[in-house]
Amino acid sequence: MLLRAYRPEDCPALAQLFYDTVHAVNARDYAPAQLDAWATGTVDLCAWNASFLAHRTLVAQLEGQIVGFGDIDVSSGYLDRLYVHKDFQGRGIATALEGALEGALSVPLVYTDASITAKPFFLGRGYRLVREQRVERHGVTLTNFRMEKPLLR
């Protein structure tokens, strides 16, 4: 597996991976209406590209195929997105991305808003639960969890 820096031409593929992953992997924890509100299929590619460029963004590739991505705001330590292709779950891709993204930080704490589905992954990586949250997307309420992890330097 190759971890590499994000390139603007990756954006459409990452948006598709995001949509496919949410609708397949997260379907065990969220209702169809929640999945549709979370991943509508109409991502603003310009806004996503700007966000990826403003953050440290890594792309995971396996045999030339994009199989995951993640991005983190290095100034605040906020892990914004971490997604692995629905067909490549459980292969250590999220762990590799998360570790590499955390390694780029000089702040003492990393934090994220984890889905119900991702919560066990983050607990296993040393994050602690701060609070359960209800967020609204397109008029639909979703549950997620603010989680944080101190970085030992």
Which functions belong to the PLM regions below?
Residues F122, Y127:
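Conserved active-site tyrosine of GNAT-family acetyltransferases
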Residues A5-P8, Q16-D87, E98-A100, A104, ...:
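Acetyl-CoA-dependent GNAT
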Residues G92:
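Conserved G/P- and acidic residue-centered "switch" motifs that form tight phosphate/ATP-binding loops
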Residues M1-P12, L152-R153:
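Conserved N-terminal entry element of GNAT/NAT acetyltransferase domains
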